[in-house]
A protein has these predicted regions:
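Metal-dependent nucleotidyltransferase catalytic core
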Residues: 1-21, 32-34, 47-105
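Hydrophobic C-terminal alpha-helix "anchor/cap" residues
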Residues: 17-18, 26, 185
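Short glycine-biased active-site loop of nucleotidyltransferases that positions the nucleotide triphosphate
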Residues: 34-40
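A short alpha->loop->secondary-structure connector
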Residues: 109-127
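A short, charged helix-loop
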Residues: 122-150
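Conserved nucleotidyltransferase catalytic core and NTase-mimicking acidic/glycine-rich helix/loop elements
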Residues: 142-266
């Protein structure tokens, strides 16, 4: 099986847009550079324009040239947020076997590059005058401790509600919401496990890598049960991972409160 040459595709994209003066630079992010690359990796690119609205729109108009530089797309979707615009493009398996390819490109003015993919590793692949390197040098690649602490406490606050609703779904014999609710707790497990190693996860993606072999077995067993014991085992694992964070993130009292609440529910 021929593997996708992600680097060659990135080079084709850069070649297609580097002649446009409004583009100041292009950087690569995501699994291609953070140690998680595999044959199924997406391509995540950030593009920075000159700092004014007109040149930003001109740079964004290059999205069609970018699509064509990669191949013939089978679908695409555009969205935007405060200072950024994004296009996600999908290519079929006939062009990129075995599963196709997704290319995500985010555009912003140079002064807003930190808003494109915050706290992400990056690699500059085109920098017209060195200004992109200067802008990205100010970007933190890790969430501040205070922000992680805030997320942990938010997860702790919601966990009992997920547990309670999962128990009700179990008693009703309603498995779809049961597993949907357990998925929320699974995400919390992954977040805590990654935080214990000073890493971060997005939802459930590649979260298993932060669990030990025995923890992974306990975690994966939660997909096969539909009873109170399944919830108990998953929350036991969650509490165990939280205890690893008590000192660093000062959440000891919060974890103790969660344990008291879970004891009352389970």
């Amino acid at each position: 099986m021929t593997l996708i040459d992600h680097r060659k595709i990135v080079e084709s994209i850069v070649k297609a847009i580097e002649g446009e003066e409004s583009v100041q630079g292009v950087f690569l992010s995501g699994s291609l550079i953070d140690g998680n690359k595999d044959q199924f990796s997406d391509i995540d690119l950030g593009i920075a324009s000159i700092n004014n609205e007109e040149t930003f729109e001109k740079a964004y108009s290059l999205r069609h040239a970018i699509m064509e530089a990669v191949g013939k797309p089978i679908d695409s979707v555009e969205r935007g947020w405060e200072n950024c615009k994004m296009v996600a493009v999908l290519y079929g398996r006939s062009q990129f076997p075995p599963l196709g390819l997704e290319v995500d490109v985010i555009f912003s003015q140079l002064r807003h590059v930190s808003e494109q993919m915050p706290y992400a590793d990056y690699e500059i692949v085109f920098d017209r005058s060195g200004t992109l390197r200067q802008a990205l040098a100010k970007l933190s690649r890790r969430k501040p401790k205070e922000e992680v602490q805030k997320e942990i406490r938010l997860h702790l606050a919601w966990c009992p509600f997920y547990v309670h609703d999962a128990l009700k779904a179990c008693e009703r014999g309603d498995s779809p919401p049961f597993h949907t609710l357990l998925d929320e707790i699974r995400k919390q497990v992954f977040f805590a496990a990654a935080a214990s190693r000073d890493q971060q996860v997005h939802g459930s993606k590649r979260g298993l890598k932060y669990l030990s072999a025995s923890e992974r077995l306990a975690f994966e067993s939660s997909y096969h049960g539909f009873n109170k014991g399944t919830i108990q085992k998953l929350t036991d694992l969650y509490v165990a991972k939280l205890k690893e964070l008590e000192v660093r993130y000062q959440v000891g009292p919060d974890v103790e409160q969660l344990q008291r609440t879970l004891k009352e529910l389970l």
